[in-house]
Regions:
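Beta-strand-rich N-terminal accessory domains
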Residues: 1-79, 345, 358-361, 365-368, ...
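Active-site-adjacent bridging/hinge elements
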Residues: 3, 124-131, 240-256, 367-383, ...
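Acidic/polar, glycine-enriched structural segments that form the non-catalytic walls/loops
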Residues: 5-8, 14, 117, 122-130, ...
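Short, solvent-exposed loop/turn and secondary-structure capping segments
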Residues: 17, 26-30, 36-40, 50, ...
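Non-catalytic C-terminal accessory modules of carbohydrate-active enzymes
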Residues: 22, 33-35, 41-63, 68-73, ...
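Aromatic-rich carbohydrate-recognition surfaces in CAZymes
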Residues: 55-59, 65, 76-88, 158, ...
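The feature captures the catalytic groove of carbohydrate-active enzymes
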Residues: 143, 151-153, 221-225, 234-237, ...
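Active-site core of glycosidic bond-cleaving carbohydrate-active enzymes
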Residues: 386-430, 478, 514, 525-540, ...
Length: 870
């Protein structure tokens, strides 16, 4: 795991998120500090929770050999942070960094999500210390993967020649509002230090917290010393660094943000090792829409507090103590199952940058970007501002790219589809792309976007094929059909395709936050893919006439795009930038932009100075021009565009948009790539091609989700070296020194679109699936030794696939997989032997297709073995 190890300055930007799915998180810093306390139902980037930290000490015969805070050297800035009086810039590094107390000289951070490990070394400390941290991440187990907790194990190895008594301590400042109360409890032999405040359980601001251990030799200090100036930290360190257990301290009256410490003492013989487990849990049950002012009317002249809803985790656990006890009681199972996933993922024979990208961006699911609503449904921001979510509403045109959730937690992805069609679909078939909270709020007033609305059709198709649940599809189909037919509806003010040509000509809102006018392969591709997917779903739902209609429109559009939008090298936008009349059709009803603060008023799409339409692509080479084909390849939909044209376009994206150094690239937009860093820009205009005076926004940026999809699409089409180079360019930028490896940015931190990286896994394995027909297949990228191993996951099960020149093993680690047919990358027609749990199965072979004739069920823990002759 050398590739995922960070030392020295390469650990300075690390904040490794520890928390549940939609439950909030806190961050483990690169040298051991606890940062980014995002546990109060909103982001809190850069936050510290007082003097919260871990510490260790070593004693022999009543004499303290050494005591240290369990972290490394403080990281810049050393002159101070922020502008607060007496503590900001000019007052030195914040005391809360714990940099003023003895700490370890060297640290080494090893990250392989969902686990992080830090190794601490100091010549003065008699022992080798490590801290391992995780939160359960178990595919398909949404409940245990949503526990609001951070799990920590401190392991100490005595490498000396005498027995040593070690103490491991965990300190947390009580973050509850109101007068804070800290109380130690014992539950079934587990020690729980519960932190609460003055608010009642039904108060919208209520929260309680707990730190707990199942270790022996426990001592607790419920309260640090209450004093002035620097008294509390100073007295604490005197107490901890003295021989023996921490002295207890209690106060009869509630305090304000009191610290509490829980410790455990272990005796370790020479050459021995001991571990102490701690868990920190939180319970902040009540959510509200803090980003928009909402007040319920209680009668004339009166207002009520904003409406609230509960976090999903609050329906599982009554308080933080309950989740702490559950976490400790189930720790072994939760850790073992998380390690099963981690080992399967990291056992994949993928290039290191690809494995890095896939694994690191799974952490987005554990960040404050994600929420789970009271019934367990999933909801997502686009990303995070420093102290609030960024861009609300499970934004469909952003979450289109996020491929992790539908394969790892497919039930949660299906909940996104269900909420979208239930709450966003309008009477005319149009769908706003942002879901409003609380559920049932008035729909967004902004116009539908092409990629978001029609991408939703592709996602319904994907979820249907991943799970094989046609009954689920039938329930959604009437709404899905209405959303497709909105394209030619007379009620569509944007006039996407009023004549049913298969090509979108009208006003086209999209994920780059503006409108295109005129046909382009990028957005028309979504339309074509939705028509093709819609036809297949219509057939499955007993609607053959609709299916035939969709296919006819699809074929017309596909032919037109190939003939009119491909310039011989790549796909362009067909538009006369000098024709102001294009805008005239959209000045009437529906031309407004209410609901999106950043949106461009209709009258501002014309530049008088340049005599041109603004925010268009024209003859540019766009990174997303064949995006719909990427989706289609991943979900088994087949060709949307001419395959030869698609491959030429992909080669053009690599040749024109990928830069090995950004030093000489002019970028007036946001800076995600600097100096000699490599990256792939959104658009380029090759020599001889007309560049709009004011092109589409973000044109020169390097946005990672787009980079990943382009890279994955190259890999899917055999351009593996080029695709890996693009992936490596992104991950090299997140090296721990310049940026946090577990926080990819776009419109904010922990950005959802970066989960396009998960699709790299399926691209390398060549995963093919149709659980409706009980089919699974793999066509992996060839390796030097002809052997390939990779993690896979579908709705019913997850596991590993191993493929060699003439043998393959399909292993189910969790769940149960029923298949009738399997495809492998083998040619020929030789004999085949298929074994399951020691029993040979009948099988008919046609080249690389192995047909079992009946459903074959691979149970949990079993493997299907296929051996073929030449």
């Amino acid at each position: 795991m050398k590739h995922f190890t960070y030392r020295g300055d390469k650990a300075r930007e690390i904040s490794f998120p520890l928390g549940g799915l939609g439950s909030g998180c806190l961050g483990l810093g690169g040298t051991g500090q606890l940062v980014d306390w995002e546990i109060l139902n909103r982001p809190a980037k850069g936050s510290r929770n007082g003097f919260s930290h871990f510490a260790v000490k070593a004693e022999v015969g009543g004499r303290v050999l050494d005591a240290r805070v369990l972290q490394g050297d403080a990281t810049p800035p050393f002159s101070g942070e922020g502008m607060a009086p007496f503590t900001g810039f000019g007052f030195g590094a914040p005391r809360e960094t714990m940099g003023g107390l003895p700490h370890f000289r060297r640290t080494e951070f090893r990250g392989g999500f969902p686990f992080a490990e830090i190794r601490f070394r100091d010549p003065k400390f008699p022992g080798q210390v490590s801290l391992t941290a995780f939160n359960p991440f178990i595919p398909h187990n949404e409940r245990d993967s949503s526990i609001p907790a951070a799990f920590f194990t401190i392991t100490i190895r005595n490498n000396g020649r005498r027995t040593i008594d070690y103490t491991a301590a965990f300190t947390v400042r009580n973050p509850a509002s109101g007068g804070t109360v800290n109380r130690l409890r014992t539950v079934d032999g587990m020690h729980v230090l519960q932190l609460s405040g003055g608010a009642g359980p039904d108060d919208p601001g209520y929260g309680d917290f707990a730190l707990a251990t199942d270790a022996g030799g426990v001592a607790a200090q419920e309260y640090w010393y209450r004093g002035r100036h620097f008294d509390n930290l100073g007295v604490y360190w005197q107490d901890f660094s003295a021989p023996g257990p921490l002295p207890p301290r209690a106060y009869e009256t509630p305090g304000q943000a009191d610290h509490a410490t829980l410790s455990a003492r272990v005796r370790v013989p020479a050459g021995g090792e001991a571990a102490v487990r701690f868990v920190f849990t939180w319970n902040v049950p009540h959510c509200r829409n803090y980003w928009k002012e909402q007040k319920e009317c209680c009668g004339e002249g009166k207002t009520c507090p904003p409406p609230t809803w509960k976090n999903y985790y609050a329906t599982l656990f009554p308080d933080a103590a309950a989740s702490a006890v559950y976490s400790l009681r189930e720790w072994d199972r939760l850790e073992n199952e998380t390690r099963l996933f981690r080992n399967a993922l990291f056992g994949s024979t993928l290039p290191a940058p690809v494995l890095d990208a896939v694994s690191a961006n799974l952490s987005i699911l554990k960040s404050p970007t994600c929420l789970r609503l009271e019934d367990g449904s999933f909801y997502g921001w686009e990303g995070c501002h420093a102290d609030s979510g960024c861009c609300e509403g499970s934004c469909t045109h952003v979450w289109n790219y996020a491929y992790a959730l539908p394969f790892l937690f497919p039930a949660l992805e299906r909940s996104l589809r269900e909420l979208d069609y239930r709450y966003n679909l309008g009477p005319d078939g149009g769908m706003p792309f942002r879901l409003q909270l609380p559920l049932g709020s008035e729909r967004s007033g902004f116009r539908p976007c092409v990629d978001g609305q029609l991408g939703g059709v592709l996602k319904v198709y994907r979820e249907w094929k991943v799970a094989g649940d046609t009954e689920w599809l039938r329930r959604l189909w009437p709404d899905v059909r209405r959303s497709i037919e909105f394209a030619w509806s007379p009620d569509n003010d944007d006039r996407w395709d009023p004549d049913g040509t298969g090509v979108i000509h009208g006003r086209q809102h999209h994920t780059l936050d503006t409108e295109l006018f005129g046909p382009n392969a990028w957005l028309t591709g979504f339309y074509l893919a939705a028509l093709k997917a819609g036809a297949a779903m219509a057939d499955a739902c007993g609607d053959p006439e609709t299916a035939a209609s969709y296919r006819a429109i699809f074929e017309r559009g596909r032919k037109w795009v190939g003939r009119n939008l491909f310039n011989g090298e790549y796909f362009i936008q067909q538009i006369d930038l000098k024709d102001r009349r294009i805008l005239e059709a959209f000045r009437g009803e529906g031309a407004g932009v209410a609901g999106e603060a950043w949106a461009v008023p209709a009258g501002e799409y014309w530049s008088e100075e340049h005599g041109e339409l603004k925010y268009q692509i024209g003859e540019g080479c766009g990174i997303d021009q064949v995006l719909a084909q990427w989706h289609a390849d991943l979900i088994g939909l087949g060709d949307i565009f001419d395959r030869k044209q698609t491959r030429k376009a992909l080669r053009a994206i690599y040749r024109r948009n990928f830069h090995r150094s950004m030093r000489d690239v002019a970028n007036p937009c946001r800076l995600y790539c600097l100096d000699d860093e490599a990256g792939t820009v959104m658009f380029s205009w090759p020599p001889g091609r007309k560049r709009p005076a004011i092109p589409v926004p973000y044109a020169q940026e390097t946005m990672h989700g787009f980079e990943y999809q382009a890279a994955g699409h190259l890999i899917l089409n055999g351009m593996v070296e080029e695709g890996v180079a693009m992936v490596k360019a992104v991950r090299d930028r997140y090296d721990g020194y310049r940026r946090n490896p577990w926080n990819e940015m776009e419109c904010g931190s922990n950005y959802a679109r970066s989960m396009a990286s998960y699709a790299l896994l399926n691209a390398f394995s060549g995963l093919r699936f149709d659980m409706v027909m009980r089919e699974i297949g793999f066509r992996p990228v060839p390796t030097r030794d002809g052997r390939f191993r990779c993690f896979w996951s579908l709705a019913a099960a997850w596991g590993e696939i191993e493929i060699g020149p003439r043998e393959a093993v399909l292993r189910v680690i969790r769940g149960e997989l029923s298949i009738r047919r399997m495809t492998l990358p083998w040619s020929g027609a030789g004999s085949v032997t298929v074994m399951l749990r020691g029993r040979r199965l009948p099988c008919r072979r046609r080249g690389g297709v192995f047909d079992f004739g009946v459903d074959v069920t691979i149970p949990e823990g079993a493997a299907l073995r296929v051996a073929a002759s030449r």
